[in-house]
Amino acid sequence: MGDSGVKYDIFTPRLQQQMQKLVSHADVITPNLTELCLLTHSDFAGLTKYKDEPDYLDRIARIAAPLKETKETQIQTIIVTGILYQAPSDDTVKYYNLVLENDQISVISSGIHGGSYSGTGDLLSAVVCASMVQGKVQLQAWKSMPVYSKDL
């Protein structure tokens, strides 16, 4: 749908509307921050202007939560990926991911290992799907990924 605050050219308003209908039937969605903003009609630039604030991740969680809370949806878990953020306790910027599952919000971080790589979201989705088949909750799925398990 988009990345780094930019919507892909192929992502038309009609496709956006259809994507919103489609995700309402999913049990788990894994949008990056741009995609979350597109799905919720949120302003990416307006949100990311708070990236240096201690409550930045809370702001993102508040944007994501309503996707789970409507009667028209069956979404159980939202995993917002690829959030660049330097938490007050960090000495450097890291990639953060928010897992909204049941009534809990988990924050998972990983150092930046050389940059951004195409296909990592697809890999994450595969791990999430396999974990669901195994009956694991999503935080357990993250712990099975070596790049994250040492950071949890």
Across the structure, where does each feature detected by a protein language model lie?
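N-terminal glycine-rich phosphate/adenylate-binding segment common to multiple enzyme folds
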Residues: M1-G5
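Short active-site-adjacent structural elements
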Residues: A87-S89, Y117, D151-L152
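Short amphipathic beta-strand/extended segments with alternating polar/hydrophobic composition
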Residues: Q104-H113
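Residues on a specific face of well-ordered alpha-helices
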Residues: Q17-Q20, S24, A126, A130, ...
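Short Gly/Pro-enriched loop/turn and capping motifs at secondary-structure junctions
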Residues: Y85, V133, S149
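Conserved phosphate/ATP/ADP-binding segment of small-molecule kinases
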Residues: Y8-I105
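Short, small-residue alpha-helix embedded
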Residues: G114-Q138, W142
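Charged C-terminal helix
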Residues: L139-L152
